[in-house]
Amino acid sequence: MLSLLFTNLITCLATSTTGEYIYNETEARILSSLSAGAYSATPTACINRILPGDWLLHLRIEIACDEGSNRCAAYIARSDKQKRFIIVFRGTKTKKQLLYEVKKSLGKKGEFYGAGRANLYFSNALSKLWPEIEPVLYDRTFKDYSLTLTGHSLGGALASLAALKIALNGFRSSDDLKVVTFGQPRVGDFDLARSYDELVPNSFRVVHGNDIVPHLPPCDKNSSFVVGGRKACSIDPKNVAFHHATEVWYPDGMEPGDKYILCKGPPVGEDMNCSNKLPFEWSKKFQYIRDHIYYFGYKAR
């Protein structure tokens, strides 16, 4: 049933009649479950449960990805019938890794192939995983296979940067490249966000309620753009932390039928009518953490 459903989703719901890319919640739920599976050393069971049929584990990667020998991981699921890959990146695994991420995120950003500046922890981690991913993209056997990239938290950041790198290198066209992430932090500066929006338009960042991680690292604020007492992120190209589009915000819950908002208002990528309008208070820190860990009713890690 799930396999047939997913087939229908990818063949019929890629774009609307106006040519605009569509967010589909059912697909997002499937990808969220696959993202949770990235925390397992054996994602085959997850693939078999979520994507029955001819879907299989094509490749799993795990490698030390920072100076503290913390490890990053990803896996690739493949369907030959659908001619499709799903590349799933794992999120932060340990508190030690989180500390390295935070330290690196507070430092300078690095140039990302001329598209803007990226968070060095994320770009360096991707560079460690890339030698295993790139041969799949080069393989002529799979040249007609479309790509969906996904991940939770750090995994979402890696998925976004990987998609941008794939587009910049011409491995896939925009129509054959899709990204859906969950609780993703900001991955780079304003210029990187705009480059991403141009090259990877079929992209959705799902945000659960008060999840704090999508608001990190903090952006520079625009004092002249204030909504409900909250300052908007500045669109100055010097802004070192800015989200790409499109946020999908679930303000109340993530059960079937719960409300979500497609956040396309100004500033693009940092819509002030969505999660950016929320005040963050230390007294609610446990709620922020819970909203980050749980997506669509299930623990994401």
Question: Where is each model-derived feature located?
Answer:
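Gly/Ala-rich beta-loop-alpha elbow adjacent to hydrolase catalytic centers
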Residues: 151-155, 159
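Short, well-ordered alpha-helical microsegments
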Residues: 95, 159, 188-189
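Exposed alpha-helical structural elements
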Residues: 26-30, 46, 97, 117, ...
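Intrinsic-disorder-associated interaction segments
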Residues: 20-27, 91, 115, 122, ...
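Short, glycine/serine-rich, charged loops/turns that create anion-binding
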Residues: 92-93, 154, 186
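Signal-peptide-cleavage-adjacent N-terminal segments of secreted and extracellular proteins
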Residues: 13-81
